[in-house]
From Swiss-Prot:
Belongs to the peptidase S54 family. Its main location: endoplasmic reticulum. Residues 269-284 are annotated as: Ubiquitin-binding domain (UBD). Keywords: Apoptosis, Differentiation, Endoplasmic reticulum, Hydrolase, Membrane, Mitochondrion, Protease, Serine protease, Spermatogenesis, Transmembrane, Transmembrane helix. It is an enzyme of class 3 (hydrolase). This is Rhomboid-related protein 4. Residues 43-103, 155-182 are extracellular.
Length: 316
């Protein structure tokens, strides 16, 4: 494991400040653990990024399948980590409260693996159908595919209404597709296939057989989940909620946490935050060449990385 020797990471500091602003005790446990794991691997990468990212060439042709486990928890830089983990905070507070910690952890683990598998299938299909072998070499890292899958779940459990994306009202059920197009249009360096893979995995859960398969695999472990400090409630839709307790027996009120979450988001919905971020990205890319790597970071092929590195040294 290689420890980073970089200077101050502004994105990481902003993420930590927002976590402490909400209060660690107010963040559901699996959401908090997911943030901690991603921050840990950012500070202590298991392998260099080029040996952690997933591509058809590396995973399938070279049988390096451990990349499926490594790629979701590695990020290109501190801003990539910041945008992904702030989005995880927003989704985790809502979904973990509704689904329960154990089921939410099960979802995170399953989605992390499946988004990588679907990404590889999409890249392989694109390479074969379009006769473009470069698709097999595109190497991606980051948690954004899982976040798009969670966004599908969030829209499924809270249907109806409209969101505003780049000034256009979009029905909530189509918000994921609009965000996919908006992010790809405004930041073309992002992994379109990685984000699309997340949406497809989310649809497999809400509209397809994935949830039933997960129910069957969980089986008796989920049905016996009533253990110390948590009260689980089950119905034909799986675990529907839980209640955590402080050590003195007082319940943790995550509903109040969700309301307080508006304080540090300035009362903006996730879509409104996305719109502001995209507009800021457009402005920033129009005024500077050295901005942070955009949301949904995708590693270019090795030759492109070498060319960019040489170009940077030539300019010094």
């Amino acid at each position: 494991m290689q420890r980073r020797t970089r200077g101050i990471d502004t994105g990481l500091l902003l993420l930590l400040s927002q976590v402490f602003h909400i209060g660690i005790n107010n963040i559901p446990p699996v959401t908090l653990a997911t943030l901690a794991v991603n921050v840990w691997f950012f500070l202590n990468p298991w392998k260099p990024l080029y040996h952690s990212c997933i591509s058809v060439e590396k995973c399938y042709q070279q049988n390096d399948w451990q990349r499926l486990l490594l790629s979701p928890v590695h990020h290109g830089d501190d801003w990539h980590l910041y945008f992904n983990m702030v989005s995880m905070l927003w989704k985790g507070v809502k979904l973990e409260k509704r689904l329960g910690s154990r089921w939410f952890a099960y979802i995170i683990a399953t989605f992390s693996l499946l988004t990588g598998v679907v990404y590889l299938l999409l890249q392989f299909a694109s390479a074969e159908l379009m006769n473009q072998p470069d698709f097999k070499r595109n190497c991606a890292v980051g948690f954004s595919g899982v976040l798009f899958a969670l966004k599908v779940l969030s829209n499924h459990y809270c249907p109806g209404g409209f969101v505003n994306i780049l000034g256009f009202p979009v029905p909530n059920r189509f918000a994921c597709w609009a965000e996919l197009a908006a992010i790809h249009f405004c930041t073309p360096g992002t992994s379109f296939a990685g984000h699309l893979a997340g949406i497809l995995v989310g649809l497999m859960y809400t509209q397809g057989p994935l949830k039933k398969i997960m129910d069957a695999c969980a089986g008796i472990f989920i049905s016996n989940a009533g253990s110390s400090g948590q009260q689980y409630h089950f119905n034909n839709a799986g675990p529907s909620g839980y209640q955590n307790r402080y050590t003195d027996g007082r319940p943790v009120n995550y509903e109040a946490t969700y309301r307080n979450y508006d304080i540090y988001t300035a009362g903006l919905s996730e879509e409104e935050q996305l719109e502001r971020a995209l507009r800021a990205s457009i402005w920033d890319r129009g005024n500077t060449r050295n901005g942070p790597i955009p949301y949904g970071f995708r590693l270019p092929p090795e030759e492109e990385m070498r060319r960019q590195r040489l170009h940077r040294f030539d300019g010094q």
